[in-house]
Amino acid sequence: MCITGYTCGDLFAQQLLLEQAEMALIQILNSTRQLDIISILGMPVVVNSTVINAAVVIQKGKILGVVPKTYLPNYKEFYEQRWFTSALQVSENSVRLCGQIVPMGNNLLFETAETTFGIEICEDLWATVPPSSSLALQGAEIIFNLSADDEGIGKHNYLCSLISQQSARCISGYVFSSSGFGESTTDVVFAGNGLIYENGYLLARSERFCMEEQLIINEIDVECIRA
């Protein structure tokens, strides 16, 4: 949730935070209006009287779609069901955001001139049947995962194995971006993991626990994925 941060806790129930998050998105839309690049931003989004943990896809000042998180962890250090509503409980297939009526759903596919991609959020990857499996069957060649994945003993290696296997299973590229040093450390610690996989193989990774902003860049060979 790059706009608000993931560790806001009960502030996710505050109208002021939700309104300011939408105002921040409007500023980003205005600032990127002349850019062709597609951006995926994590933020809380109000749907009727509920709040979803969502990925918002934007390009050239327009919102292309909103993808709600499907599986909300509610165990150990996580209690997301206290604040958010699962995609499984949202019946609407569109939402009004920043004055635009945009598609919404955990099954959305986004097409570019070069490829088709889908999105899942954090815990979705850890589910028995991740949304990315269905997205790949529908034609997604690249999966993006916006995450707030905290650290634990042995967890990083497990995460890398999980992404590698899912990328190979889906025969896809998999781009994973997680929260870093800007999050609160009251309950947990975030390493800022950035990982790019292609069909099970690691292509690029960020430096863990870096105290500065990072950018990792790598090409994903979609022709190889299609072969």
Residue ranges and their predicted role:
Residues M1-A227:
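Enzyme catalytic cores with a strong preference for nitrogen-chemistry domains
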